[in-house]
């Protein structure tokens, strides 16, 4: 059954069908999106089941069904019942409007609906204008009811290359006490998606702007203010440098573990006593423990950890590679080749880091 036929069947029974969420956003951005989600307005759940007996309900979810390999959700409201991102009471009813359903969504660019039959947009929060301006903005103050939205916003910044507006950053900070309620599995999923983004650095930069980076990424937060020799690093501190390296590596590989290795290759600089700035003697060895700690408390894959450790242990060799004996050069190449990191090193990263003096 085609979507248009489903929409007409719903209309005959007094309802409307809307395309919602990321599919609408990505269509307006000219991006591909094969995950289409629909919102059913104006009919009760029992009516929907009678109209589409082939629809499969998703677990114990409230009014969410799989039909024709697409997701259909009855319009609903969410009421906060406690602390955390799962403490919500969900209500579905035929008198809930599409505008009310959109109100519960996190940011304006995700709160746009498109009528399947007429093509008319429902955009009560100005999401289309924010898409044009490349801005991420919370729909309402209800944004603060779900702490996971902090990481979702940061992830959208990295995948869309959008800027988060000031009031939303302030709301992200206000939710900070509840961030501890988010499971490490959910944080890992958001981090994984962010690392796949066009500019993965924006995930961490956004969290820094909201002053919540330290909550789950304290190892990276310690890089902020870690001064480096200006003759080698005119870009700024170790945090700025790591963000630049991450984005350059992202330009040449889509592998998450390689991007992660770029992110953490200089974590050892966060362990340097301030009185030793701008030098970071032995930071390649000092970086191993922070990488292990970060991977442990976030539950990151072993492959990510091994790649990160290889990156921090070996990234200083490039500066002296041409001075090494051939046998030592071969040993180095073999070590990297046998590691999960492999020889897929970012050429630009090598030029920017390995050809510099290694004394820092």
Predicted features along the sequence, with ranges:
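Catalytic cores of the polymerase beta-like nucleotidyltransferase superfamily
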Residues: 1-360
